[in-house]
From Swiss-Prot:
Domains (record comment): The SOCS box domain mediates the interaction with the Elongin BC complex, an adapter module in different E3 ubiquitin-protein ligase complexes.
Organism: Homo sapiens (Human)
Localization per Swiss-Prot or TrEMBL: Cytoplasm
SMART domains referenced in this protein's UniProt entry, alphabetically: ANK, SOCS_box
Coiled coil: none
Keyword annotations from UniProtKB, A to Z: ANK repeat, Cytoplasm, Developmental protein, Repeat, Ubl conjugation pathway
Gene3D superfamilies given in the database record: Ankyrin repeat-containing domain, SOCS box
Pathway: Protein modification; protein ubiquitination
Pfam families assigned to the protein according to its UniProt record, in alphabetical order: Ank, Ank_2, SOCS_box
GO terms for biological process, alphabetical: intracellular signal transduction; male genitalia development; negative regulation of cytokine production; proteasome-mediated ubiquitin-dependent protein catabolic process; protein ubiquitination
Name recorded for this polypeptide: Ankyrin repeat and SOCS box protein 1
Subunit-structure text: Interacts with CUL5 and RNF7. Interacts with TAB2 and TAB3.
MF (Gene Ontology): ubiquitin-like ligase-substrate adaptor activity
Domain of life: Eukaryota
């Protein structure tokens, strides 16, 4: 094997010298290099040139390359035209490519889908087009983040609403390969991967509420089992603990109480005006928590929590169709 080569015969980094882009093309493009030299399809997707896309895709040679991963004029990682258009937020190009046969859930070398990069770059229109075309609202299990997590972190409530409307899971599913590994073989050992946690850490109250309305677990924001003993020492032990430690306003605490959080998970006696976290505990938030902890929840509140949990988060959208009086349905929907 030549120096700098790989076991499969592809050239290694050394063979391309300092031209990293060329090496990436050699390693990850879908077709031989001579086919990858023509990047007009990918370049048109990048600049949003719909007319050029229409013209090129009239030819069979380009239609056959619509899902080809290739390095384009301004990019380093080989991507499909759809992924490139979604990154740039060219909604008309995204829509056209899908109608011409582009696969919506193909991933790049990082495991990112077109939907994920549309969300990351804040493109609501492209996000909606991809969701309407059947893109998985949860992104790819081969990527460490999800569209919901990113939208919650940056406070894009409009994008988060769209993801939830199309069935995105608002809880963490901590199984990378559920088809292969035994069920529950991986346990949650940190809250930092959870949408509720990250929305609280960045004080995005609207996103926090949307997640709870969609049925997010108010304690650990996780689908599977939780290993609290595996949490880092000094890290929050539940979502309520995180809300207090991050100095969130009282509204965050009130929402968790309203949605049935287990208040006994927090050792609130150890919390004072100063927190071991990066911020001070909000005095009003701490007072709301202590008051909620000191008195039993009302029967009305307990009934609402019980009904919503019995329905399950994937059937909460059916509440408006239940044969119940409108005031009760609004109550169940927290309206």
């Amino acid at each position: 094997m030549a120096e700098g080569g790989s076991p499969d015969g592809r050239a290694g980094p050394g063979s391309a010298g300092r031209n990293l882009k060329e090496w990436l093309r050699e390693q990850f493009c879908d077709h031989p290099l001579e086919h990858c030299e023509d990047t007009r399809l990918h370049d048109a997707a990048y600049v949003g040139d719909l007319q050029t896309l229409r013209s090129l895709l009239q030819e069979e040679s380009y239609r056959s390359r619509i899902n080809e991963k290739s390095v384009w004029c301004c990019g380093w990682l080989p991507c499909t035209p759809l992924r490139i258009a979604a990154t740039a937020g060219h909604g008309s190009c995204v829509d056209f490519l899908i109608r011409k046969g582009a696969e919506v859930d193909l991933v790049d070398v990082k495991g990112q889908t077109a939907l994920y990069v549309a969300v990351v770059n804040g493109h609501l229109e492209s996000t909606q087009i991809l969701l309407e075309a059947g893109a998985d609202p949860n992104g790819s299990r081969h990527h460490r983040s999800t569209p919901v997590y990113h939208a919650s972190r940056v406070g894009r409530a409009d994008i988060l609403k769209a993801l939830i409307r199309y069935g995105a899971d608002v809880d963490v599913n901590h199984h990378l390969t559920p088809d292969v590994q035994p069920r529950f073989s991986r346990r949650l050992t940190s809250l930092v991967v959870c949408p509720l946690y990250i929305s609280a850490a960045y004080h995005n109250l609207q996103c926090f509420r949307l997640l709870l309305l969609a049925g997010a677990n108010p304690d650990f924001n996780c689908n599977g089992p939780v290993n609290t003993q595996g949490f880092y020492r000094g890290s929050p032990g539940c979502v309520m603990d995180a809300v207090l430690r991050h100095g969130c306003e009282a509204a965050f605490v009130s929402l968790l109480v309203e949605f049935g959080a287990n208040l006994n998970l927090v050792k609130w006696e150890s919390l004072g005006p100063e927190s071991r976290g990066r911020r001070k505990v909000d005095p009003e938030a701490l007072q709301v928590f202590k008051e909620a902890r000191s008195v039993p929840r009302t029967l009305l509140c307990l009934c609402r929590v019980a009904v919503r949990r019995a329905l399950g988060k994937h059937r909460l959208h059916l509440i408006p169709s239940l044969p119940l009086p409108d005031p009760i349905k609004k109550f169940l929907l927290h309206e």
